[in-house]
């Protein structure tokens, strides 16, 4: 029996910290169900080739579609937590924001992982790992004198997902 056996987590697919967080929870025994998007312009890895998909179940839903949202609501009805990494307001527009989910499952822990937080001057700006570590000053230490700073890894995303 694993530490998180019996816990059900819903993960809305994305890049970086959300999938890493879901992977770690699945590794610890939680049942993690990743909701993949049917079509996206994001450079997401093929679900079967994505290392962060390990130990997870997955389902492909178009959350802009009413029938898909009904299935989403059914999935969260007995879930313990949800992992979401979209810009502020995206899930609310889809009808699956925290208040929408609370009506279906008041005990659901709604975890949001965003680059710049839920409010503030950068909250609605898209961001990626290199943006976060540059603004934090970490990127400066990764380059040589008079050479470009090349990050060693996706440090900011990994830090956000753990």
Predicted regions: what they are:
Residues 10, 52-103:
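A structured beta-alpha segment of the ubiquitous adenosine-cofactor-binding alpha/beta core
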Residues 46-52:
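Active-site-proximal loop->helix
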Residues 35-44:
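NAD(P)-binding Rossmann-fold cofactor-contacting core
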Residues 24, 28, 94-162:
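Active-site-adjacent "lid/gating" segments in soluble enzymes
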Residues 18-19:
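N-terminal Rossmann-fold NAD(P) dinucleotide-binding loop
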Residues 11, 27, 31-36:
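Short beta-strand "acidic-cap" motif of Rossmann-like dinucleotide-binding folds
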Residues 4-6:
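Phosphate-coordination loops involved in phosphoryl transfer and adenosine-cofactor binding
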Residues 37-38, 63, 88, 115:
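Active-site loop/turn elements of alpha/beta-hydrolase fold enzymes
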């Amino acid at each position: 029996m694993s530490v998180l056996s019996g816990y059900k987590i819903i993960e809305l697919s994305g890049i970086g910290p959300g999938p890493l967080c879901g992977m770690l929870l699945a590794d610890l025994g939680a049942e993690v169900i990743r909701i993949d998007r049917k079509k996206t312009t994001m450079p997401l890895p093929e679900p079967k080739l994505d290392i962060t998909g390990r130990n997870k179940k997955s389902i492909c839903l178009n959350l802009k579609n009413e029938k898909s949202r009904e299935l989403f609501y059914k999935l969260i009805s007995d879930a313990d937590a949800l992992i979401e990494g979209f810009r502020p307001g995206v899930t609310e527009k889809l009808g699956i924001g925290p208040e929408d989910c609370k009506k279906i499952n008041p005990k659901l822990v709604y975890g949001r992982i965003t680059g710049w937080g839920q409010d503030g001057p950068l909250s609605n700006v898209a961001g990626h790992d290199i943006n976060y570590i540059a603004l934090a000053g970490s990127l400066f230490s990764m380059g040589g004198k008079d050479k470009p700073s090349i990050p060693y890894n996706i440090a900011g995303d990994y830090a956000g997902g753990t």
